[in-house]
Every structure is written in structure tokens, then in C-alpha cells.
Amino acid sequence: MTVDEKKDSLISYRLAQAKEAIDDAAFLFENHRGLRSVVNRIYYAMFYAVLALLVTEPFQGSKHSGVIGYFNKRFVREGIFPPETGKYLNLAFEARQESDYKELFMKKNKS
């Protein structure tokens, strides 16, 4: 398999992950399974889509904040995506952090 074929395969995989996360979010929402899980799946749909895009870039990293930062710098600030896209990605990240780790944040604040 060539490098380009490997990249194409990884892009397809990441986009399939994004689609699955969207489908999961819709199912959870429609079946009243809890907003926390819906927020998580929506964020991950966005994150996987960004990871698919970054396969085409010289980006190395896996931390969510690094991925989002690179996306905003390279694609939003350069006008490839509108500012709202970066804003929504940041909001989804913050909402996912809060919903997934709220209990942890509350314990830290009590200390």
C-alpha cells in the first residue's frame, strides 16, 4: 500500500468514526438516553472529522487541545473554514469536558 493509499484509508476510517458518532448521538437523543452522552458523541463526531482533515497536514499530535489549536490556526484563521466552525468546535470541546469531568472539577473546587 502506498503512502497516499494509507492516508486515504485513514481518512475513510476517521470519517466513518465521525458518522458513527453522529448516528450514536441521534439515537441517544431520540431515545432520551441522557444529554451527557449526546454531547460526548457530538464532540467526538467533530473531533474525528478534524482528525480526518489533519491526515493531509504535517501535524503530529493526539491531544485534543493540540488538534483543535492546529485546526483553528491552519484552517479557521487562514479563512478555509468560517470562524463559526472553530467556535462550535471549541464549544463542543468545553461542553464535553464539563459533562465528562464535571464531578472531577467539583471535587477540585471543594479542596
For the regions a language model picked out, list residue spans one by one.
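Terminal alpha-helical segments
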Residues: M1-S111
